[in-house]
Regions:
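Partner-binding and oligomerization surfaces adjacent to conserved cores of proteins
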Residues: 1-251
Length: 251
């Protein structure tokens, strides 16, 4: 499927399509994904960092110097964050603070192949995936100052605007993010800040791991629940905190 030039053109700043990527869902959300076989991308305004979606919070200047709001463009974009990080204490504590997280594994190729609707004649304008670039605050501010409305909104292609959603402050570089992006051209796909898409999890995902802080009995209980829902993907527990004691010799 990646033989389609238009699809390959919508992969931004990514060379290895078989790079493993991960995401932590809540147990409740992942259970819903198993049953519904659907995945939701959210409006960038719901992202946490105040500098996120910075372009959409600003005005841009026309070539004649007139300032215009980018809020209309804001309404038509949705995204979902993934990471190259296999296991991270910070990620578990942020996204699974109640020990109710599920880390899933896939690849850029598997995720985007399922997401990109090649039957849609406007697919090249709507479905994208890219690696986040981390920049100093001053670099971002210089980028904003030099950006015009024409730079990002005109020309018929979504790539320049998509790249603005792939910029984040360098303080967050540890997140090592990859973002799935959707441009809702007709404005009728999303609802209440969420755009839902088919998600063939049994084809896309290769691994499911539960929170490393669960006890063995808690892990077995949650594992059985997922299996009962129909999850056929191997389910393990993150070994982030596993420690095998070693005897110390006193010579």
């Amino acid at each position: 499927m990646f033989g389609e030039p238009t699809m390959e053109n919508n992969v931004i700043n990514l060379e290895d399509l078989d790079t493993p990527i991960y995401r932590i869902f809540s147990l409740e959300r992942f259970s819903n994904i198993i049953v519904s076989r659907e995945n939701g991308l959210v409006h960038p305004s719901k992202w946490d960092d105040p500098f996120e979606n910075f372009l959409l919070k600003n005005q841009a200047k026309m070539t004649d110097g007139t300032n215009v709001s980018l809020s209309q463009l804001s309404a038509s974009w949705y995204g979902q964050c993934w990471t190259r990080n296999f296991d991270s204490d910070a990620m578990w504590r942020i996204y699974s603070h109640c020990k109710d997280g599920v880390r899933v594994k896939t690849t850029v190729r598997a995720l985007f192949s399922n997401f990109y609707d090649s039957a849609d004649k406007f697919a090249s304008l709507k479905y994208l995936i890219g690696s986040v670039e981390y920049k100093q605050r001053e670099e971002i501010e210089r980028f904003l100052a030099a950006t015009t409305f024409t730079d990002i909104a005109l020309g018929g292609q979504p790539h320049k605007f998509a790249k603005s959603l792939l910029i984040k402050r360098s303080e967050f570089s540890h997140e090592n993010e990859i973002r799935l992006l959707f441009h809702d051209l007709k404005g009728n796909h999303g609802k209440n800040g969420v755009a839902v898409f088919p998600f063939n999890w049994d084809i896309i995902l290769s691994e499911v791991a539960l929170d490393p802080r669960l006890t063995e009995s808690e892990f077995q209980i949650e594992k059985k629940k997922l299996v009962a829902l129909g999850c056929t993907i191997p389910i393990t527990q993150s070994k982030l905190y596993k420690f095998n004691p070693t005897k110390i010799r006193f010579d």
